[in-house]
Curated annotation (Swiss-Prot):
Subunit field text: Heterodimer of a large membrane-associated beta subunit and a small pyruvoyl-containing alpha subunit.
GO cellular component: plasma membrane
Name assigned to this protein: Phosphatidylserine decarboxylase proenzyme
PTM entry text: Is synthesized initially as an inactive proenzyme. Formation of the active enzyme involves a self-maturation process in which the active site pyruvoyl group is generated from an internal serine residue via an autocatalytic post-translational modification. Two non-identical subunits are generated from the proenzyme in this reaction, and the pyruvate is formed at the N-terminus of the alpha chain, which is derived from the carboxyl end of the proenzyme.
Cellular compartments annotated: Cell membrane
Family: Belongs to the phosphatidylserine decarboxylase family. PSD-A subfamily.
Annotated catalytic residues: S209
A single MF term (Gene Ontology): phosphatidylserine decarboxylase activity
Gene that specifies this protein: psd
Cofactor(s) annotated in UniProt: pyruvate
Principal subcellular localization: membrane
Pfam families per record: PS_Dcarbxylase
């Protein structure tokens, strides 16, 4: 009579979950938080801690902390390896594809350039990433209004911060952070002379808004209005 083969002692041992492996699983599942979001998360946790005896205060604090953790998430991204690619500088939905003069404060002239605008909702990741590899040759902040960022006039009227990047081949791409109705705080960590790699994080807009990308003359966008973008990964166009 045939017998079922027995497993050896070494193979019958149950796999163990070490603390290091558990930590690696958590890190791969939960994206890190951008440093700018930590004070907001801490404030929510503080409210929950101070009011832990009151259910409404505890829940409100925990919900606020969780929402801020989602808003300020900083997920890892893998930029394309294709030479000459221009990637989306922000998560969101493409709301405008047109031609427009670059921001006047950059002194690049008034000749229209191809422009791709991305609208960020409060549910999108707030961080912005370099659309190309190159050197930061100009950073200019301009005060303005805080109108709804999905309106066409937002690019001209709202507060904005422009970063001009020059690639190794001399092509220039401009990424403009535009404030909005809810987003009233632009953070830019890029400075003139910095060398950025495509997909590097250089700033954020608190609680959504808009990102305008001005492309070199002759560039043809390969995206469409209404398309969702992933910062650092979605290709907007190729350098001419």
């Amino acid at each position: 009579m045939a017998r079922r083969p027995r497993r050896s002692d070494s193979s019958s041992a149950e796999p163990t979950l070490s603390p290091q492996h558990l930590l690696a699983l958590v890190r791969s599942t939960i994206p890190p938080i951008h440093p700018a979001g930590r004070p907001f998360i801490a404030a929510g946790l503080a409210v929950a801690g101070v009011g832990y005896r009151h259910r409404w205060a505890r829940r409100t604090g925990l919900l606020a902390a969780g929402a801020c953790a989602g808003f300020f998430r900083h997920p890892p991204r893998v930029p394309p390896s294709r030479a000459g690619a221009i990637v989306a500088p922000a998560d969101g939905v493409i709301c405008v594809i047109d031609t427009a003069a670059p921001p006047a404060e950059l002194s690049m002239g008034d000749a229209p350039l191809p422009r791709v605008s991305i609208f960020l909702s409060v549910f999108d990741a707030h961080v912005q990433r370099a659309p190309v590899s190159g050197e930061v040759v100009a950073v200019q902040h301009r005060p303005g209004r805080f109108g709804s960022a999905d309106l066409p006039a937002a690019s001209d009227d709202n507060e904005r911060n422009s970063v001009r990047i020059r690639t190794a081949n001399g092509a220039e791409v401009v990424a403009v952070q535009v404030a909005g109705l809810v987003a009233r705080r632009i953070v830019c960590d890029a400075h003139v002379g910095d060398k950025l790699a495509i997909g590097d994080t250089y700033g954020l807009i608190r609680f959504g808004s808009r990102l305008d990308t001005y492309l070199p003359p002759g560039t043809e966008p390969v995206v469409r209005v209404g398309q969702r973008t992933i910062a650092g990964e979605t290709i907007l166009a190729d350098l001419p």
